[in-house]
Regions:
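Catalytic-domain carbohydrate-binding cleft regions of carbohydrate-active enzymes
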Residues: 1-187
């Protein structure tokens, strides 16, 4: 990364890495949560993984939005992945070559429209993400944080710690992680 920056200082470079060591985030490194399965369970686990990385000081974390392995995707599941990923520091929709690609137009009109709305929201947030990418973490609030950061002593918050996140400083999102939930909750 440092070599690329010296080669062309006008550009900002980043890499997506499977591993991490302290200090990498200053170089533009992005961590992702690995090759996860296409499932509601995997979607439900991602907020906790992302929050853990952020609490450890890693500013940019992503996942294979939609899941990577398996053919269990449904229009509703993929829509929920898109809606969750639209608010993450890095949105990376990705799947195995053996799976149906996670393109909105392949999942029906209603799901495709909902996924496009999530993508449009993501595009509206691009200036914010670019500003965060250009500003070192100590000089700005984290992009993602737990809602309960000040209430660790209260027992009722322990379970929520893995699923609720405050994104983009002022937006609060709890991603839908079960099929019965029909919309992203906003608090």
């Amino acid at each position: 990364m440092m070599g690329l920056a010296k080669f062309d200082p006008k550009k900002r470079f980043f890499t997506i890495n499977r591993s991490y060591s302290p200090g990498m985030s200053r170089l533009g490194a992005v961590i992702w949560t690995g090759d996860i399965s296409v499932s509601w369970d995997s979607l439900g686990q991602q907020p906790g993984y992302v929050l853990n990385w952020h609490m450890a000081g890693v500013g940019f974390v992503t996942c294979d939005s939609g899941g990577f392995n398996g053919n269990n995707d449904t229009p509703l599941l993929l829509t929920r992945w898109y809606q969750y990923a639209a608010f993450m520091p890095v949105m990376r929709v990705h799947s195995s070559i053996n799976n149906l690609p996670h393109f909105p137009f392949l999942y029906g009109e209603a799901a495709g429209d909902a996924m496009r709305k999530a993508l449009n929201m993501r595009y509206q947030l691009v200036p914010y993400h670019c500003e965060c990418a250009a500003t070192p973490l100590p000089l700005r609030p984290p992009m993602v944080g737990t809602l309960e950061i000040g209430a660790f002593g209260e027992r009722r918050f322990f379970g929520a710690l893995r699923s609720n996140c405050a994104c983009l400083q002022t937006l609060s999102r709890t991603p839908p992680t079960r099929p019965a939930r029909l919309a992203m909750a906003s608090r």
